[in-house]
Amino acid sequence: MISSVYFKRSALVCALAAAFPLAAQTEDTLIVTAKPDDSASAQTQGYSAKTSTGATKTDQPLITTAQSVSVITRLQIADQGANTVSQALQYTPGVYSSFGGGATRFDTISLRGYHGGDVDNLFLDGMRLMSDGGSHNVLQIDPWFIERVDVIRGPSSALYGQSVPGGVVNLTSKRPQFSQQGHFRLTGGTQNTKGAAFDYTDAINDQWAWRLIGMTRSSDTQYDHTREERYAISPSLLWQPDSDTSLLLRADLQKDPSGGYHGSLPLDGTRYAHNGRKLSPSTNEGDPGDGYQRREQIYSYEFNHQFNDVWSAYSAGSYTHTNVSLDQVYQVGWVGDSDMLSRGYSGSRGSLDAWSTDNRLRADFTTGELAHTLILGAEYHRFRNDLWTGAGNAAPLNPFTGYTPQTGHTITYSDNNNRRYYQTGFYLQDEMVWNRWHLDVSGRYDRIVSQQVSDTSGTSNRRSDDHISGRASLLYALDNGLSPYLSYSQAITPAMLPGADGTLLKPTTAEQVEAGLKFQPPGSSDLYSIAIYDLMQKDVATRDPNIATATYIPAGKVHSQGVELEAHNQITPQLSTIASYTWNRLRFQDTKDGTDSNTPQLSPDQMASFWARYQLPAGITVGAGVRYIGKQWADDANTERLPSVTLLDAMARADLGAWSTAMKGAYIQVNANNIGDREYLSGCYGTGNCYWGAERSVTATVGYDF
C-alpha cells in the first residue's frame, strides 16, 4: 500500500501535474520546419527524443516501449553544464546520482534505490563499460563526447546479462556526420576551473565521414589540497558505401593525471558539531601527497548490414585498456573525544585489459496479421585486472586546524593479485504487433565466471554460474496518444564477495512487475509518463555477524516499490520544460543482521525536479531548475537520518550572432549550480563515512558553433 507520504504537497509535484496537458488539447501551436532523423543513433534535437534502442536493442518509439525509459539529450547536457554523467542524470526520475557530492572521480548512480557499483549499470554504445568495480579501475566517460544518455529503469538482464536490478544507463557517443559541423569552446569558473574543447565533423566524400573530438579541463575542486585534471580525445571514421551498410571505427583516449577527492567524513562533525565545531565542506582528511591517476583507452567498431527486406546483421566489439594508480590516506573515526581523526592508508596499482563483443541477427516479417521483429544475439565479455594493493596506518590529523607535515604512512599489508571475469550470453527477443497491441517477449542464457587469484598467497577463488533471465511486456497504443502497459522482468548481479570458507557467493537475482501509462500528443515530441513498480532482489550479501573478518553470507532481500512521473514538453516554440517526481520505498527483508524492515542507506524517500528553458528576443536564452532530494538514512541500521534539501540551478546564454552577423555562431554561456550555496550531506555509507554535497559553482563558456 502506497504510503500517504506520496501525496505530500510540494511545489515541484504541482508543477509536474500542471505540465500534463489534456488528451483532447489541440495542436495549433505545432510548428514543423523539417523532418529530423528520429532514429536513436541520430543527433538529438531539443529536450525530447522519440525513439530509443535501450530497452529492446531495436529502434523503438518510446511511446510504444513497455518499460520506463528516459533520454537526456545533447542540448540538455549542454544547457545544464554537466561535467560528469552523474551530473547529467540529476533531473531524471528514479535516479539518485548525487550521493558522491563534490567528489566526482567516479559516476555513482543509484537506480530505483539500488546502487550496485560503477560497473553493472553503465554501458557505452550498447556494450558494457568494462570496469572492475572490485578495484579502483573504474572508467569514466566525459559528457563532451556523448550525444545522448538513455536510462532504462527496471531489471534488464534479458538483453544485457549482468546488471543491477534498478536498470542500466547507456551512453551514446557522438558519430561522424556527412555535413560540416564544428564546436569550439573555452571555459573558466569558480574553484579555478579552466577548460577547452573542440568537436569537428565532415564528409570526406559521399561514402566516408570523420569526426575528431577533444577536451581538457582542470579544477582545484571544493576540497583542500586536491585537484582534478583531464585530457581526452576521440577520433572516429564512418564508412557508408550505401544505405544498407555501415562501418564505424572509433577510439576513446583519456588521461586523468589528477582524479580529485574521494574521501569521506564522520556524521559527527558534519551533520552534528563535534566538540562544539563542525567541519567545513572543503575539509580534506587526507594528505596533500594523495593521488589518483587514470588512463583509459577504448578501441571499438560497429558494423550494420541490411541483407534484404527481412534480414539484417549487427556486430560490435571493443578492446579496453586502463591503468590506475592510487595513494590515499583516509579517516577511520575520531580518536575518543579528542579533535583528532584516526587515519589509514590505501594504495593500489592496476592494469586492466578487456574485450567485449555483441553480435545479432534481426528479422522483420509477418505471420498473418501479426508483425514480428525478431533478434537473435550472442555476447562475450572478459577482463583481467592485474593489481597491487597495499594498506597500512597513517598519522592522526586534526581536521579543524588543517594539515601539518606528518610522519608519513606505513604499509602493513600488500598483495599482488589479479581479478578475472568472463561472461558469455545468448539472447532471443520477439517484438510482436497486432493492430494497436504490442507484445514483447525476450530471454537470455548467461554463463558468468568470476575468479580472484592471489600471487602473494598462492590462493585462487573461482565461481561459475549459469542463469536464464526473461522479460515479457504488453502495451496498447490508442489513437489519442495514450499507451498503457504492463511488464515483468528479471536481473542477475554477481556478488564477487567471499564467504566464510573463502569461496565467492552466488549472484543475486531480482524480478519486477511494472505498470505504466505514457502519453504523447499525436504529431509532437512531447512525452508524459507514469510508472508504478514492485521490485524484489534476493540473496543480497550480508556481513556475517559471527565472524570478525570481512566475510559475507547470502541472506536477505531488498524490496523496492515506487512511483515515477516524468514530463518532457515543448509548451511554446520558445519554452521547453522537463519535470520529474519519484517516490521510492525500500525495505530489507529476511536479513540476519537485525535490519529487517529497515531502509537501505543512500535511498531518498522522494525526489523531484523541474527545469525550464526559455528563448528571449535578441538571441538570449535562459534556463532555471530546482532539485529536491528527500530524507534518507545515513546507515542501514537506521539510527541517523539526513534531512531533505532543495537546490537551485540556472543558465543564461547569449548568441552573439543575433547582435552582429560577423559573430554568427559565437556565444557566451554562464551556468550556476547550487546557487544558494546550500551546505548539505549528499549521502553516507554508514555514520562514519559521509559526503558533503557539491558547493556552489559558477562557470562561464565562450564558444563558436558552425
Regions from the PLM with identified roles:
Residues 257-270, 382-387, 449, 475-519, ...:
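Surface-exposed extracellular loop regions of Gram-negative outer-membrane beta-barrel proteins
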Residues 130-131, 136, 145-147, 158-233, ...:
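Outer-membrane beta-barrel translocator/receptor signature
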Residues 27-179, 491, 515:
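Acidic, small-polar-rich N-terminal luminal/periplasmic segments of exported/outer-membrane proteins
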Residues 436, 534, 554-636, 676-679, ...:
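Gram-negative outer-membrane beta-barrel transporters
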Residues 302-318, 322-328, 484, 507-589, ...:
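Membrane-embedded beta-barrel scaffold of Gram-negative outer-membrane proteins
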Residues 238-242, 352, 371-375, 379-383, ...:
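Structural signature of Gram-negative outer-membrane beta-barrels, strongest in the C-terminal barrel
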Residues 619, 631-634, 654-706:
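C-terminal beta-signal and adjacent terminal beta-strands/loops
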Residues 217-221, 234-306, 321-352, 395-419, ...:
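Acidic/polar loop-and-plug regions of large Gram-negative outer-membrane beta-barrel proteins
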